[in-house]
């Protein structure tokens, strides 16, 4: 896999990078490519945000954490100072990197590194910067130059170095390297112990913390929402208070106006009552004469209405006599209609027998229905006294009695024929 790193404004590509490749190995490969020694730091930049990567961090894993924003993240190699063994005169002789795209593979150190289980990763001390002394050297060379720097400088600056001093220096370096190796072994054992102890709970803790972060984000969003709602409600409350104050002022003004109007009404009522009493006294005198005249008129009207009532009674009696005669004629017509209906039934029966040749039993009309029809006629006959309206007959005679010759069933007894 390829990793793009910006070095002095030039984009360089490091090949052979995997998820277990550390930032220290990437820095060493780039330092070899540009041919400069010194102290370097690998920076992860996204927009205006920068983060220094530790030597033991994996740049591929760090980029994968950005998700969809990984393409916007830049890795920058920045030189923060000279190396420990770099002479002061070497600063003036610095190579200028070429402004071209350069590919550099990882040094053999990454290939020869022993295979370790991914679940047990070595945690080195967190440092914000890296020191490179030219080439991919072993751990003994990197960590063995701490305390002998002053002594080595004195030995190198002294032109009269003897063999004993060189042997002494070599012996000191060997002893120091052995002690560092022992310390490294003990540190590695301790690191593996603590990693095995806490690695099982680490993922659960990470998941728990991520869930807690999500819950906190949701709570923060809810708090922001309710804060906005609170501000809106406070503004509404302020507006309502102002409106309430205005309404109270208007109510006070209306009450004052109402009191003034009530006082004016009382004065007007007192004046109206005085005028009313005065008019009543005047009208009482005038009304006596008018009442006498009206009484005379009423008596005359009563006499006239009495005469009219006599004439109406005579007319009512004449109408009743004519109504009785009409009722009698109507009864005669009803009887004639019943007789014709019976004859029509006989004719229909004879036609039915001639057409079908079946025996037919003829049932006579029920007397109850005939009596009910006569009762209806008698019920319609009486005339209400005092009314000039003539009650209409509930039966209507056919205009042409020849219509009865058609074979139809009688309305008095629709079920009178049984076959």
Swiss-Prot record:
Widely expressed as a 6.2 kb transcript. A 2.2 kb alternatively spliced transcript is expressed exclusively in testis. Keywords: Chromosomal rearrangement, Phosphoprotein. It comes from the Eukaryota. InterPro entries: N-RASSF, RA_dom, RASSF8/10_RA, RASSF8_RA, Ubiquitin-like_domsf. This is Ras association domain-containing protein 8. Pfam families: RASSF8-10_RA (PF21712). The modification Phosphothreonine is found at residue 131. SUPFAM superfamilies: Ubiquitin-like. It comes from Homo sapiens. One of its GO terms (biological process) is signal transduction. The keyword Phosphoprotein applies. The modification Phosphoserine is found at residues 105, 129, 387. It is linked to A chromosomal aberration involving RASSF8 is found in a complex type of synpolydactyly referred to as 3/3-prime/4 synpolydactyly associated with metacarpal and metatarsal synostoses. Reciprocal translocation t(12;22)(p11.2;q13.3) with FBLN1. Residues 1-82 form the Ras-associating domain. The keyword Nucleotide-binding does not apply.
């Amino acid at each position: 896999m390829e990793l793009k790193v910006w070095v002095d404004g030039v984009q360089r590509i490091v090949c052979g990078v995997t998820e277990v490749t550390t930032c220290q190995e990437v820095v060493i490969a780039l330092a070899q490519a540009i041919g400069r020694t010194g102290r370097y730091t690998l920076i992860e930049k996204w927009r205006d945000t920068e983060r220094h990567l530790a030597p033991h961090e994996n740049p591929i894993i760090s980029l994968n954490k950005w998700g969809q924003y990984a393409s916007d993240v830049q890795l920058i190699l920045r030189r923060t100072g000279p190396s420990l063994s770099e002479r002061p005169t070497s600063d003036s002789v610095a190579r200028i990197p070429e402004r071209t795209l350069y590919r550099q593979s990882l040094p053999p150190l990454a290939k020869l590194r022993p295979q370790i289980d991914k679940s047990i990763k070595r945690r080195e001390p967190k440092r914000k910067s890296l020191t490179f002394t030219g080439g991919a050297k072993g751990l003994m060379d990197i960590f063995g130059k701490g305390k002998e720097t002053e002594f080595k400088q004195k030995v190198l600056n002294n032109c009269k170095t003897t063999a004993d001093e060189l042997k002494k220096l070599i012996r000191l370096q060997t002893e120091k390297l052995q002690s560092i190796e022992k310390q490294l072994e003990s540190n590695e054992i301790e690191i593996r112990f603590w990693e095995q102890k806490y690695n099982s709970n680490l993922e659960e803790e990470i998941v728990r913390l991520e869930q807690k972060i999500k819950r906190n984000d949701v709570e923060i969003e809810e708090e922001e929402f309710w804060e906005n709602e609170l501000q809106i409600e406070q503004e509404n409350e302020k507006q309502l208070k102002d409106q309430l104050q205005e309404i109270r002022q208007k109510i006070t003004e209306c009450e004052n106006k109402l009191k003034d109007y009530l006082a004016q009404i009382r004065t007007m009522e007192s004046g109206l009552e005085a005028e009313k009493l005065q008019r009543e006294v005047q009208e009482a005198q005038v009304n006596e004469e008018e009442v006498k005249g009206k009484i005379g008129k009423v008596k005359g009207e009563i006499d006239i209405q009495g005469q009219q009532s006599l004439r109406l009674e005579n007319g009512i009696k004449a109408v009743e006599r004519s109504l009785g005669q009409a009722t009698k004629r109507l009864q005669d017509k009803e009887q004639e209609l019943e007789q014709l209906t019976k004859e029509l039934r006989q004719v229909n029966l004879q036609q039915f027998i001639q057409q079908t040749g079946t025996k037919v039993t003829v049932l006579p009309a029920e007397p109850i229905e005939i009596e009910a029809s006569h009762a209806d006629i008698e019920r319609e006959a009486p005339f209400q006294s005092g009314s000039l309206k003539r009650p209409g007959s509930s039966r209507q005679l056919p205009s042409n009695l020849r219509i009865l010759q058609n074979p139809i069933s009688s309305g008095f007894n629709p079920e009178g024929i049984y076959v």
